[in-house]
Amino acid sequence: MLGKALLLLLSSPICALAQSAADYYVKSIPGQPDGPLLKMHAGHIEVDAQTNGHLFFWHFQNRHIANRQRTIIWLNGGPGCSSMDGALMEIGPYRVKDDHTLVYNNGSWDEFANLLFIDQPVGTGFSYVNTNSFLHDLDHVSSHMVTFLDKWFAMFPEYESDDLYIAGESWAGQYIPHIARAIVARNKNIDSKQQPWVLKGLLIGNGWISPLDQYPATMQYAYAEGLVKEGSSTATSLDAMNDACAQKLADPGSQNMIRIGQCESVLDSLMRLTRTSEEECVNMYDIRLKDASCGRTWPPDLDPMTRYLQRTEVRSALNLDREQTNSWTECNDQVGFNLRLENPGVPAVHLLPDLIESGVKILLFSGDRDLICNHLGTEQLIHNMKWSGGTGFETKPGVWAPRRDWTFEGDAAGYYQQARNLTYVLFYNASHMVPYDWPRRTRDMVDRFINVDIANIGGTPADSRLDGEKLPQTSVGNTTSSTSESDQVDQEKLKDAEWKAYAKSGEAALIVVIIGVSVWGFFIWRARQRASRGSSPSKKGYRSVYPGGSNNTSSSDGAGLLSRFRNNTNNNASSDLEARDFDEAELDSLSPGLQNARERDHYVIGEEDEEDEDIGNGAKSSLH
C-alpha cells in the first residue's frame, strides 16, 4: 500500500513540476558573440495554477560586484509589450545584429547589477495564460509579480538580500509604482521566517504616470516642436479635440482614471492630420523620423529581434515550454485590451509620494524627442506633485532645485534636477527608448543612482560632469572607461606575482638540495673517520646524535647512522619547504579584487570602440 502511494506521489503533477535553479540554466545561446558566455537563467514560473498563468524571465548575472550586490528588474509597458525589448534593444548585454547573430551592447546595465527581465502580465511575450484569463486590474498584476518573486528568490536565494531596483519605460510607469507598493506591503506583513526584500529605488523612463498632467502635454509638445502650425486648419481641429479632453479631465471622476478615450483621440488625430502627401507621418516615439506607420514598426532592430526570438533553437535555449509558447510577438493586443477595458487602478502618480516617504528613491528620465510620453508632461507631473513636505523640486518654500547641465565625455547630454529623493534627468536627442539611443549615458545615470563605488575595482572612470563639476567615479564599458582595463591590469599583476612565487619556491628548493648534499657529505665523512679509527685498541666509540643511540659502534655504524638520517629525512617529507615558502597571501594583497580576478574575467566582455550615436532611419500606438 505504501509503495503504491509513493508511486502516485512521484507521478503527480506537483512532483513533476518541482524545479531547481539548474533547470533554468542557459547553457548557450544561438548566435552568441565570441568570448565567454555570460551566466544566464531563463524559463517559466507559475503564478496562478487555476488559470495556467506563467511568467517568463531571463536573468543575467552581473559581470562585476562593486561595493554590494544589486538586482535590477526591468519591465516594458504597452500594456502587453514584452520585456525582451529591454533585454535585446536597450539595457541587456546583447543586441541582435541580424536574426542569427548577437553582438555585445557597449553600455549594458549588467556590469554592476544583476538584470532580471520579466514578461508580464501573463500573456505578454513568452508568458502565457488561458485565453479567457487575461488580467483586468493592476492589483492582480502586482499580486502575480509578488508571487513570482517569492518563487524566484526561493529558487535563487543568493539574490534575495540584494539591493532591489525596478526599472522600465512607458506604460511600466503604471506597473512599477503599483508593484513597488505591493512589495512594501508584503515586507510589512511577512512572518519571522520570511526575509524582507530590500527595495531601494525605481527608475522610469518616458513613463505614463499621470494622465491628468500628460494628456494636455501632447498638444503643448506638438506646438513647441513645430509639428503643428498654430492657426492652421489642422490646429483648429486638434484644438477642438484637446478642449474636449480638457473638459473630461476637469470631471472629478477623471482624477482616478488611467485611460480617457476623449484624450486618446488627440494623438491619433494628430498622426492622421499631419500625414504628408507621401503618406508618411511623424514617428510618435522619435519625432526626428517619419514613416508610413507613424513609428509602429520602429526601431529598426525590432524586425531582426522578432525573427531571432521566433527561432526554435532560441526558444529551446531559453528553456521555454514548447507546447505553450509557439512564437513571440512584441505586444499582445489582448493583454492591453483587457487591462484598459475598465479602469485598472489608481494612476501611479498618486502612489509616488508614499513610496518616496517610505525610503524608496525614484528616478524619472525622459528623451526629448519622444511625443507619446513627452518630457513636458513628466516635468508637469513633478511640478504639481507634493511629497516630503514640499511641492515639486522645492528645496524650501518658493525656492526650487536648479537644473544642472550634464556633460558626458565632453558632449552636452542633458540636465539633472533633484530634491527630496526624487531625481529627474532629461536626455538630449533621445527617443522614447532612451537606452536604445544612448546605452552608455544611461549606464552612467543608473550607476550613479544605485551608488556604484568602483574604488575597489579600478578602471578609468567616465568623464561625467554636472555644471562642469566632475561626478564621483564610475566606469561605462568602453576602451577608455571600463573595468575591463582594470581586469587586464589585475591579470598581469597576478601572473607577475605567480612567477615571483614560483621563482621564490625554486630558490627554496635549490637551498634544500644544497643543504641536503652538505649534510649527506658530512655524515659520509664522519662515518669514514670512525671506520678508519676502528683498529685502535683503546677506542671508546662515538655517541650517537640520535636519542637512544648506542655509545659503542663498530665499523658499520657509519652506514647505520646515515641510514637513520635518511629515515628521519623521509619522515619529515610532509614538511615541504617549497610549499611553506609559497605564500599565496602575497597574491591576495595585490588588491581587494585580485583574489577573484580569474572568476571575474570569465564574465568580462571585450570592449568596443564604438561611440554612442543617434539611431535614425526606420520606424507602435502602444506604450512600450
From Swiss-Prot:
One GO molecular-function entry: serine-type carboxypeptidase activity
Residue stretches of biased makeup (Polar residues): 472-486, 565-575
Residues linked to a glycan: 106, 421, 429, 478
EC number(s) on file: 3.4.16.6
InterPro entries reported in the protein's UniProt record: AB_hydrolase_fold (IPR029058), Peptidase_S10 (IPR001563)
Active site per UniProt: 170, 370, 432
Keyword Membrane: yes
Spans traversing the lipid bilayer: 505-525
Keyword field: Apoptosis, Carboxypeptidase, Glycoprotein, Golgi apparatus, Hydrolase, Membrane, Protease, Signal, Transmembrane, Transmembrane helix
Acidic residues biased stretches: 606-615
Topology relative to the membrane: Single-pass type I membrane protein
Residues covered by region (Disordered): 461-491, 533-624
Main location: Golgi
Assigned GO CC terms: membrane; trans-Golgi network
Protein function: Protease with a carboxypeptidase B-like function involved in the C-terminal processing of the lysine and arginine residues from protein precursors. Promotes cell fusion and is involved in the programmed cell death.
Protein name: Pheromone-processing carboxypeptidase kex1
Organism the protein comes from: Talaromyces stipitatus (strain ATCC 10500 / CBS 375.48 / QM 6759 / NRRL 1006)
Gene: kex1
